[in-house]
């Protein structure tokens, strides 16, 4: 009987601890998901992990760990991918210069933008624009 009581108490304690962990994860998931949506809606903004982490009262390291565990990508990768998707849209729909487009998408350096764009798409911004203009 005593052993059964210990097992029951141990089980209840484990459930309490787990539910507390789950509540904490849900709280952070909601906050980090909102940040992720903000990044995707405004990729041109000057995002930096330290400021974002401070916004949710986490250390940058803990923030990055949680972000990766929730979304299976890093915050930095999300920022870059959002900027590249934004650039792709404007390359297809405007005749904005590459220099202006890079600044518009949040890059301080046009060369850095062109390198990242090629890394993620396999082509330069100019090649991407030409390819999509010829499709129309």
List where the protein language model places each region.
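Intrinsically disordered, low-complexity basic tails/linkers immediately adjacent to helix-turn-helix/homeobox/MYB/SANT
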Residues: 135-136
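Short, Lys/Arg-enriched, Trp-marked, Pro/Gly-tolerant hinge/linker segments that flank
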Residues: 2-56, 69-81
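Basic/polar phosphate-binding segments, predominantly the helix-turn-helix DNA-binding elements
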Residues: 46-82, 102-127, 131
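Residue-level recognition of oxygen-bearing side chains
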Residues: 96-97, 112
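Short alpha-helical segment immediately N-terminal to, or the first helix within
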Residues: 38-42, 89-93, 104, 128
């Amino acid at each position: 009987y005593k052993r059964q009581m210990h097992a029951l108490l141990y089980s209840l304690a484990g459930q309490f601890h787990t539910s507390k962990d789950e509540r904490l994860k849900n709280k952070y998931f909601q906050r980090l998901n909102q940040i992720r949506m903000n990044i995707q809606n405004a990729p041109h903004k000057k995002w930096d992990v330290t400021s974002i982490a401070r916004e949710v009262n986490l250390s940058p390291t803990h923030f990055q760990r949680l972000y990766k565990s929730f979304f299976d990508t890093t915050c930095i990768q999300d920022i870059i991918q959002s900027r590249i998707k934004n650039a792709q849209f404007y390359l297809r729909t405007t005749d904005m210069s590459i220099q202006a487009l890079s600044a518009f998408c949040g890059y301080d350096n046009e060369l850095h933008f062109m390198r990242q764009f090629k890394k993620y798409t396999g082509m330069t911004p100019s090649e991407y624009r030409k390819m999509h203009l010829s499709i129309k």
